[in-house]
């Protein structure tokens, strides 16, 4: 089946047809590194990591570019307020974003260009726009002229006369609708030499130049948060048109993380930093939560919703841990016991439908429930093979979403949830099995009080006992 994605520009689902067969080129607007990241910032990283994973699962080679905006009005303001050099402020928060992406298991991009490293490319791009009659320099600033650019407004659907670029009038602007590509130097601010005088980049020219530098004049998909649709992405596309580039063939935008119906943002003061949220759940559980809603939907944050998502992930994790013990007879968490298998056709069908993750997760949990029923039966060779096949399907599906509990990224977390180190787990297994033997003897003698006492004591210690056809099994709660 062909992947269909919602193209913001077309306002409809479109079949994904890459420019080059077997290859996908993607540009994601990355972080403006002005502050530590909150969960709203990293949702796009998770959402489009899932896109990348799915394209790769379908056999495509993916070139994935995610930029860093390391020079910006907000960065300069924050650095000045904190009496820090702008470059140090930007570098500190770039590291914080990369830490957050790593914590959430987001695959590193093919390349992560910084704006400050691409000023020559921006200068060349602006010169092309000026030469083509769509831009001009005035008092050290360089402006683009939307009124002269074909199809301006195609992405946001706004009319030119009604647009607000969110800029001041600007020195030398010929038309208030023009937007800034390059800002003239100001005292105390970083500046670079250009044919029009010293200055620094505007926000929009950075991405147009970096995207085409690495992906060419035309590429497959441009991604980013819904809040970037206008003016940023509209102006990126306009600059590309003005320069003579085809630019992105598909535009994808993810919804916001909201609190009480409002977008999570520093200005509203309703942010939840990644370190603070990770005090409530494990990194993989936060990733599961951020990826669990459809990428175009708003994701309303609450601790209850976060907890429900974490519980959903743990059901998958617990099934795989139990499946390993069922197949091997050992409690050690060994991923090789359950090789990654084939994905069910129903899962692929849901993912091909504009990355319908909620429905895809429903498929995973249906398969987990099927597997759990088998785990309650006596472990015959035939039953073990069935469990391996089902577990392999679960792993394959979870891997696409970046939440396979037995993957290298999450294996240590899974081992810890299953009881810590192999040595500690082995010791605990001996002790618990001794208690379970005492309980079995009590049950055989119809000493129900003692049997219940053993079970209750184990429960108080965080150990859950499940009676199966092959005897009592135990696992750690939560």
From Swiss-Prot:
Ranges spanned by the short sequence motif 'HIGH' region, renumbered to the chain: 31-41
Coiled-coil annotated residue ranges, if any: none
Motif ('KMSKS' region): 263-267
Location in or out of the cell: Cytoplasm
EC number: 6.1.1.16
Gene Ontology CC terms: cytosol
InterPro entries xref list: Cys-tRNA-ligase, Cys-tRNA-synt_Ia_DALR, Cys-tRNA/MSH_ligase, CysS_C, Rossmann-like_a/b/a_fold, tRNA-synt_1_cat_dom, tRNAsynth_Ia_anticodon-bd
Cofactor: Zn(2+)
Entry-linked Gene3D superfamilies: Cysteine-tRNA ligase, C-terminal anti-codon recognition domain, HUPs
Alphabetic keyword roster: Aminoacyl-tRNA synthetase, ATP-binding, Cytoplasm, Ligase, Metal-binding, Nucleotide-binding, Protein biosynthesis, Zinc
Similarity section: Belongs to the class-I aminoacyl-tRNA synthetase family.
Subunit structure: Monomer.
Name by which UniProt lists this protein: Cysteine--tRNA ligase
Organism this protein belongs to: Corynebacterium jeikeium (strain K411)
Classification lineage: Bacteria, Bacillati, Actinomycetota, Actinomycetes, Mycobacteriales
């Amino acid at each position: 089946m062909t992947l269909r994605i919602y193209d913001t520009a077309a306002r409809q689902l479109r079949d994904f047809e890459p420019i080059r067969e077997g290859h996908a080129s993607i540009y994601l607007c990355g972080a403006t590194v002005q502050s530590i990241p909150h969960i709203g910032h990293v949702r796009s990283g998770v959402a489009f990591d899932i896109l990348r994973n799915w394209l790769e699962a379908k056999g495509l080679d993916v070139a994935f570019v995610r930029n860093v905006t390391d020079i910006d009005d907000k960065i300069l303001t924050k650095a000045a307020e904190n009496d820090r050099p702008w470059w140090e402020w930007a570098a500190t928060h770039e590291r914080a974003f990369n830490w957050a992406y790593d914590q959430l298991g987001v695959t590193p991009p093919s390349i992560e260009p910084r704006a400050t490293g691409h000023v020559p490319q921006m200068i060349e791009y602006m010169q092309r726009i000026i030469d083509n009659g769509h831009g001009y320099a005035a008092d050290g600033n360089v402006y683009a002229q939307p009124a002269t650019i074909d199809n301006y407004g195609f992405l946001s659907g706004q009319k030119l006369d009604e647009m607000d670029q969110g800029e001041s009038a600007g020195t030398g602007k010929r038309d208030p609708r023009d937007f800034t590509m390059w800002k003239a130097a100001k005292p105390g601010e970083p500046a670079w030499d250009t044919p029009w005088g010293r200055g620094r980049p505007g926000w929009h020219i950075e991405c147009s130049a970096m995207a085409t530098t690495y992906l060419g004049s035309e590429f497959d998909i441009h991604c980013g948060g819904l809040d970037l649709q206008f003016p940023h992405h509209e102006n990126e596309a306009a600059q590309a048109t003005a320069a003579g580039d085809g630019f992105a063939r598909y535009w994808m935008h993810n919804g916001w993380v909201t609190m009480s119906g409002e977008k999570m943002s520093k200005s509203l003061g309703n942010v939840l930093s990644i370190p603070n949220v990770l005090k409530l759940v494990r990194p993989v559980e936060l990733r599961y939560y951020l990826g669990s809603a459809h990428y175009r939907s708003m994701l309303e944050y609450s601790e209850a919703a976060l907890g429900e998502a974490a519980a959903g992930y743990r059901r998958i994790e617990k099934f795989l841990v139990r499946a390993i013990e069922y197949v091997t007879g050992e409690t050690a968490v060994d991923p090789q016991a359950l090789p990654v298998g084939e994905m069910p056709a129903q899962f692929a069908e849901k993912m091909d439908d504009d990355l319908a993750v909620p429905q895809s997760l429903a498929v995973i949990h249906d398969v987990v429930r099927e597997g759990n029923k088998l785990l309650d039966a006596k472990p015959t060779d035939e039953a073990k093979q069935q469990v391996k096949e089902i577990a392999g399907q679960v792993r394959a599906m979870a891997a696409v979403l970046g939440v396979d509990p037995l993957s290298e990224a999450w294996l240590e977390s899974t081992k810890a949830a299953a009881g810590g180190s192999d040595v500690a787990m082995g010791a605990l297994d001996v002790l618990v099995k001794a208690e379970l033997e005492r309980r079995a003897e009590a049950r055989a003698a119809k000493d129900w009080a003692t049997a219940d006492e053993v079970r209750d004591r184990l429960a108080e210690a965080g150990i859950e006992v499940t009676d199966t056809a092959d005897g009592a099994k135990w696992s750690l709660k939560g």
